[in-house]
Amino acid sequence: SFTGSPEVGRLVARECGQNLIPVKLELGGKGAAVIFDDVDIPEAADKLAQAITSHTGQVCCTATRWLVQKTIYDDFVNAAVDRLKAVQIGHPLGEGTQMGPVVSEVQHKRVLGYLEKGTAAGAETVLEGGAAQVEGCAGGHYVKPALLAGSLDNVAAREEIFGPVAYLASFNDESEGIRLANNTDYGLANSVWSSDLARCKRVASQFETGNGWINSHNVVVHGVPYAGVKKSGMGGGVVSLETLLDYYRNISVIRPL
């Protein structure tokens, strides 16, 4: 098995294919949160802020595209900005720290680079990110949470950044929300946010992903298959009974009666 980027996943699959070795790939993501106008706005903003800042956004299944129904777009954005501004950045073992550094200097430059590329390509800066300074941690690879908005064709909306950056866009109705959520090369995880459970089930069933959540995100339940489709992997189950089947093979033995 391999967990990592789609680019390296292709190389692993190619090498395994040359020797007919089965391989399971769990690759990147560009998850969407589809947020309807009957949602509890403060609660949704809080949970999605937690999702995007958990592990400093270095989670392949997190929601990095926030699709908000137009009728509540401004209210949701304001709530999300206020919530993200309150995130305490600091040493991972520090008291009160809610978000630590990214994993390396390379990743630090990658996150900042995508913010620059996104704005250069026309994205609106809703919440300015950038490097963060933490007292007593000079040289640490800290970044601030950031929100961009605009066309979903923007590079920051299409490519995996792997940092605390979300991209905002609005939609009019249910069908458009589903279409925008699925309009990506990735297929790891999406979520739907609404007080209407029937709508949530209907929308989630149309996600082109291996995983979906209702009024939550990044909640992993052991025993439930976890995997991606499209550019996010080759399906199958992780942390579930299906995982054990990777270590078994079937053999048919037939005898005359």
Residue ranges and their predicted role:
Residues S1:
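N-terminal Rossmann-like NAD(P) cofactor-binding module of classical short-chain dehydrogenase/reductase
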Residues G4-L152, I214:
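ALDH superfamily catalytic-core signature
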Residues V34, Q88, A138-L257:
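Conserved C-terminal structural/oligomerization subdomain of aldehyde/semialdehyde dehydrogenase
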